[in-house]
Amino acid sequence: MADNDIEEAVARALEDAPQRNFRETVDLAVNLRDLDLNDPSQRVDEGVVLPSGTGQETQIVVFADGETAVRADDVADDVLDEDDLSDLADDTDAAKDLADETDFFVAEAPMMQDIAGALGQVLGPRGKMPTPLQPDDDVVDTVNRMKNTVQIRSRDRRTFHTRVGAEDMSAEDIASNIDVIMRRLHANLEKGPLNVDSVYVKTTMGPAVEVA
């Protein structure tokens, strides 16, 4: 359970959000400090599974053949085989469109080298190289887990944003998501909470509310 300060900040952000004719996301903005973000080892870049879900559809594409492809077809948004990979390698525009439309990629481990060669220049800079699927991994479990995953990534910027829910989720559920993200962040930053300058939560069009 998240602490009351987080839940109160989320409740204020939801209450202060103007009414719109579309479903707004709820986002977290984190401001870092005392880190050399020119050093890749000090940057934030990892996936976090949200206990209450992301509140939105997460687009997942699987690179696979055979039985894995058949099983992935039931849960992934698209399943691509070696022939599809070859086509994408010859069509940079299509590869870029796919990368921009997809949140996460998963690939059978034997395909990773071919994917790196064919799509590395497209997926790499976007931070979207596939998660390797090992022989003992269940593709259905992996995809379902990633549907509730967000990527927290600072790159070389002091401030980064991540989705933590949607406006029709409860403040408690959104706060639980934020709590998991902050705990992971504190555990991985060099100085823990001391490397976090401030944290804000807001809906897409609403005002930012500081999380104490």
Curated annotation (Swiss-Prot):
Keywords: Repressor, Ribonucleoprotein, Ribosomal protein, RNA-binding, rRNA-binding, Translation regulation, tRNA-binding
Gene: rpl1
UniProt cross-references to NCBIfam families, sorted A to Z: PRK04203.1 (NF003244)
GO molecular function, one term: structural constituent of ribosome
Subunit structure: Part of the 50S ribosomal subunit.
GO biological process: regulation of translation; translation
Protein role: Binds directly to 23S rRNA. Probably involved in E site tRNA release.
Organism: Halobacterium salinarum (strain ATCC 700922 / JCM 11081 / NRC-1) (Halobacterium halobium)
KW rRNA-binding (keyword) present: yes
Protein name: Large ribosomal subunit protein uL1
Source superkingdom: Archaea
Organism placement in taxonomy: Archaea, Methanobacteriati, Methanobacteriota, Stenosarchaea group, Halobacteria
InterPro entries reported for this sequence: Ribosomal_uL1, Ribosomal_uL1-like, Ribosomal_uL1/biogenesis, Ribosomal_uL1_3-a/b-sand, Ribosomal_uL1_arc, Ribosomal_uL1_CS
GO annotations of cellular component type: large ribosomal subunit
Family statement drawn from the similarity comment of this UniProt entry: Belongs to the universal ribosomal protein uL1 family.
CDD domains, per the entry: Ribosomal_L1 (cd00403)
